[in-house]
Amino acid sequence: IGAVRDSQSCHVELICDGVHVHPSVIRATFAMFGAERVILISDSMRATGLEDGEYTLGGQPVVVKGNLATLHDGTIAGSATNLMDCMRFVVKNAGISLEDAVMCATENPAREIGIFDQTGSIEEGKKADFVLLDKELNIVGIYIDGKEQSC
């Protein structure tokens, strides 16, 4: 937090899976830095989207239950939550606006790694990769290169 506060060119990366960071800390971070300096990340491991069970992460056995991956001693090993679920969590549980959550999951990361001229927003000349959401923030459409994909 201190490094980001001291450097205007840094972003805060928040794991918003409902395990790593409490909603009150999410709200405080947005209030302190503004949505323009927050990047949502998932800390997602390769077992994300698979059934609960035992998997390997970095050569270590991990147990996945719900959206959490732990070592056998209970230590958090990572998340089994995708970025869409993280975005949904900040909106529904931390009270962050949908517009800010989308910016933090798309535009801000693209700017940070220097590819905002290609992706990160829906604009002419950019990659047309996006999802359509319903009012409950469920994915109802997926588009890659402007072509609808099956959900």
Which functions belong to the PLM regions below?
Residues 136-143:
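Short, Lys/Arg- and Gly-enriched loop/turn segments at beta-strand edges
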Residues 2-18, 25-133:
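His/Asp/Glu-enriched, well-ordered alpha-helical/loop segment
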Residues 20-21, 139:
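Glycine-rich nucleotide phosphate-binding loop and flanking beta-alpha elements
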